[in-house]
């Protein structure tokens, strides 16, 4: 874990960041969020989370890059957790394709985990937005990552599970997205893996199998870039 000298951090409520929350959204919403970066507040839409395995396969990484590239070309903001694997692929693909990205992290803003992503975190802080619900000085606990995924589901208009096993932390976000009534997409490769059972159960509760990228668009808040292909 890498420490950094912080500055320019702001403290916001979720309502300031996102707009009014309903009772379901308020249940697990953090009381306050710490943010760093120049992105406009309230956050513009659409915002789509890409989540998945830290120890991602080459195929999973390629899928994350492809999905992120497609979405930023439709003016969507890529949200992810700055972890190794799928998260890193999603953030970097957004940046490499002149898109926007938001990192929701499980550490205070003055720390980086993994340490190898410190440079990426700094770049997103300078040019986009990094969000944490953990105050500077807070301990970094295992449960932080579950709380982070709940918050990321709240921030996002939709979540896509790109790659996962049954013990993957990204599944916490999937269940929270369903609880919130937000679209949850599960990439086809996850559902075609016979060793993975939990995502199959998610389909029974409203998750959507994602075979073609265009299938995401009708579920997102509409802007001109999206309307060009939806109509």
Question: Where are the model-predicted features located?
Answer:
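Glycine-biased, small-residue-rich flexible motifs in mid-sequence functional cores and linkers
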Residues: 4-231
């Amino acid at each position: 874990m890498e420490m950094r000298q912080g500055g320019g951090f702001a403290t916001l409520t979720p309502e300031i960041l996102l707009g009014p929350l309903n009772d379901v959204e308020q249940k697990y919403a953090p009381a306050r969020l710490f943010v760093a970066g120049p992105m406009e507040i309230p956050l513009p839409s659409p915002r789509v989370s890409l989540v998945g395995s830290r120890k991602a396969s080459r195929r999973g990484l390629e899928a994350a890059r492809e999905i992120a590239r497609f979405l930023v070309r439709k003016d969507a903001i890529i949200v992810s957790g700055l972890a190794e694997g799928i998260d890193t692929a999603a953030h970097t693909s957004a940046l490499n394709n002149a898109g926007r990205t938001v990192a929701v992290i499980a550490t205070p803003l003055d720390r980086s985990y993994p340490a190898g992503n410190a440079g990426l975190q700094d770049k997103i802080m300078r040019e986009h937005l990094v969000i944490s619900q953990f105050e500077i000085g807070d301990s970094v606990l295992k449960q932080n990552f579950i709380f982070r995924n709940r918050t990321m589901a709240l921030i996002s208009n939709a979540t896509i599970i790109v790659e996962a096993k049954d013990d993957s932390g990204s599944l916490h976000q999937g269940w929270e997205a369903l609880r919130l009534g937000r679209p949850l997409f599960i990439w086809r490769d996850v559902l075609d893996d016979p060793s993975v059972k939990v995502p199959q159960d998610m389909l029974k509760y409203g998750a959507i199998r994602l075979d073609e990228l265009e299938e995401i668009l009708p579920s997102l808040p509409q802007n001109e870039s999206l309307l060009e292909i939806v109509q």
